[in-house]
């Protein structure tokens, strides 16, 4: 058994951007693990460590050398490998080349099957780990794939930021590595302010402590320090809550080497600005964490995670307060300027905004949404007042896209429209619908809180889906530029929250609205859109552990109303399960199951009873899916039964 040592490979550079660094950590881990496996070196745990100025691989228990390997490989039959004069043929030369030996080194002998073959005897010597690690380390730096990399000086090598040092140790031995004229050593660099300059690392085991003494903490330590600081802030303000989106929090961890949690404030006047654009400005631009009070209202305070000398905390707070004041001044100006215009004015400006080159402007989209949202409201509620509210909300839903606030803070589309609608005196249902009509933005997201919002959301998403299919640009497995897949999942979730909507009818209505605006829509598009929804429903059914045969059977009959599709599929799966379990009492067992199911109507009980009385009539050659498809057609399930 070869002796083992720990291996340390640190790439030191100028400060790296946080988001690319986060992705590089996972990428670096794969490179290190695959490289060591391919090299033949045995190794233990691999840890990837990072700070804004370093990316590091720490590998436990790396063997000091590869094992010596003796191996015999069998090649082609001798009669094929050599000609009549005993000269090697192309077959022999190819086999020898593959094995890394000369054809003259091949031997001939009879194998266990009685035939004579050629053999290559391979003796692969042991290779020192230092040599292998030196080659691997150089290749790993070059192999890291950054969204944007750069060259510096007169060097051709690339990295996300200029490389300044390399600390590469195998035990106490320095592994020779050179990249962009930087040569490896046993030194690292500390914090720019708290521990500037080079610091010697005797062995990999000393690395963490050397960094700590030089004012640098590794990821988990930094995370713990930041969380502890935030808990102290919350404890000092009973009932308060610090908003820490995971993505921003991970970025902040990778922006500091010696984090310190500080609290800043902004002027009271900015609390009159919608809290969403205040928090977006702080989180997206400055990576500050807003603080909310016990009632969930935004306060004037925010958290800054500093990487500076702790003795300079007051100056750091003052500097960050000046930065946030400037940003919030802009947000306040945009909001107040927008309030000088009505949403109807903004809505007319949508004529200049392209929705999709072949599908016209956003104004045309809102006109289609108005008609479709009103139809959806009437289908669901039979209430003309609800239909008028839905049409009004759809008319104004996209108006804020041309507002100054949304141009600056794009993720607040809809939200700002809701504020402007309230300020203009629109009904609360309309304002809420405008604010929430983009929901659900992803699988599992909240639905709009009110009916009007759901009607507008369905109209918006269905209009996009039908339009993209109408111009023959449907999503593919690798491309979905218009987020059709996400829109379809949203429509399914929204329709499931209603009682009376017919998705097939709504698809037809949406396509007809495009025709009325002059778009030529092929008759086959209706079927294409329906099949797309069936595909999404099949995926949902699969996630709900419904059998593949049942999904196939229900898909075959063209059901696209979500609840009906899923309930039919569940019923087919469970009924077949019960009929298999109680073959000797088919009618009673299935009827017992059906009686216990809250999803299935009395009509279905009778249908299944009749079918199972005649089950002997089914030929054995009939496939399961064709049989269940037939049965599924006869079902009357769910709220429409």
Task: Pin down the residues of each PLM region.
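Amphipathic alpha-helical "coupling" segments that flank catalytic cores
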Residues: 1-641
């Amino acid at each position: 058994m070869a002796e083992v040592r720990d291996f340390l490979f640190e790439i030191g550079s100028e400060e790296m951007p946080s988001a690319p660094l986060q992705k590089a950590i996972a990428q670096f881990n794969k490179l290190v693990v695959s490289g060591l496996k391919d090299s033949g070196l045995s190794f233990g745990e691999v840890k990837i460590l990072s700070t804004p100025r370093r990316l590091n691989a720490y590998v436990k228990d790396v063997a000091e050398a590869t094992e010596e390997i003796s191996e015999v490989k069998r090649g082609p039959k001798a009669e094929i490998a050599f000609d009549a004069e005993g000269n090697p043929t192309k077959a022999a030369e190819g086999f020898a080349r593959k094995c890394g030996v000369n054809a003259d080194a091949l031997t001939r002998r009879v194998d266990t099957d009685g035939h004579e073959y050629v053999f290559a005897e391979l003796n692969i010597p042991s290779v020192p780990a230092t040599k292998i690690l030196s080659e691997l380390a150089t290749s790993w730096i070059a192999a890291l794939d950054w969204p944007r990399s750069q060259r510096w000086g007169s060097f051709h090598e690339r990295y996300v930021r200029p490389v300044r040092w390399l600390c590469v140790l195998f035990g106490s031995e320095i592994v020779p590595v050179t990249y962009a004229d930087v040569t490896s050593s046993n030194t690292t660099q500390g914090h720019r302010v708290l521990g500037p300059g080079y610091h010697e690392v005797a062995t990999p085991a000393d690395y963490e402590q050397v960094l700590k003494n030089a004012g640098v903490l590794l990821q988990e330590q930094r995370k713990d320090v930041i969380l502890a600081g935030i808990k102290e802030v919350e404890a000092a303000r009973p009932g308060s809550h610090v908003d820490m989106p995971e993505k921003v929090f991970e970025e902040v961890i990778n922006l500091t080497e010696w984090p310190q949690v500080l609290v800043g404030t902004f002027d009271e006047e900015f609390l009159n600005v919608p809290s969403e654009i205040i928090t977006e400005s702080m989180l997206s631009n400055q990576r500050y964490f807003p603080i909310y009070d016990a009632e969930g209202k935004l306060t004037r305070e925010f958290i800054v995670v500093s990487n500076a000398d702790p003795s300079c905390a007051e100056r750091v707070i003052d500097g960050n307060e000046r930065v946030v004041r400037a940003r919030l001044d802009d947000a306040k100006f945009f909001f107040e300027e927008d309030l000088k215009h009505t949403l109807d004015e903004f809505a007319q400006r949508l004529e200049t905004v392209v929705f999709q080159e072949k599908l016209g402007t956003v104004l045309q989209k809102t006109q289609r949404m108005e008609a479709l949202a009103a139809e959806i409201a009437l289908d669901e509620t039979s209430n003309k007042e609800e239909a008028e509210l839905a049409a009004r909300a759809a008319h104004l839903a996209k108006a804020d896209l041309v507002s100054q606030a949304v141009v600056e803070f794009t993720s607040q589309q809809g939200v700002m429209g809701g504020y402007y609608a309230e300020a203009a005196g629109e009904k609360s249902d309309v304002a809420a619908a405008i604010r929430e009509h983009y929901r659900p933005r992803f699988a599992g997201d909240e639905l709009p809180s009110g009916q009007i919002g759901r009607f507008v959301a369905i109209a918006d998403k269905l209009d996009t889906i039908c339009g993209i299919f109408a111009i023959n640009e449907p999503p593919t497995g690798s491309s979905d530029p218009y987020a059709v897949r996400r829109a379809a999942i949203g429509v399914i979730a929204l329709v499931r929250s209603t009682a009376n909507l017919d998705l097939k009818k709504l698809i037809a209505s949406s396509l007809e609205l495009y025709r009325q605006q002059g778009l030529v829509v092929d008759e086959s598009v209706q079927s294409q859109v329906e099949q797309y929804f069936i595909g999404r429903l099949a995926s949902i059914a699969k996630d709900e552990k419904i059998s593949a045969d049942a999904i196939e059977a229900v898909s075959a009959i063209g059901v696209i109303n979500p609840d009906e599709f899923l309930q039919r599929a569940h019923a087919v799966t469970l009924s077949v399960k019960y009929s298999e379990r109680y073959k000797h009492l088919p009618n009673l067992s299935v009827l017992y199951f059906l009686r216990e199911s809250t999803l299935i109507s009395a009509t279905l009980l009778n249908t299944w009873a009749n079918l199972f009385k005649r089950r002997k009539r089914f030929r054995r050659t009939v496939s399961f899916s064709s049989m269940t498809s037939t049965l599924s057609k006869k079902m009357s399930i769910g709220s429409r039964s």
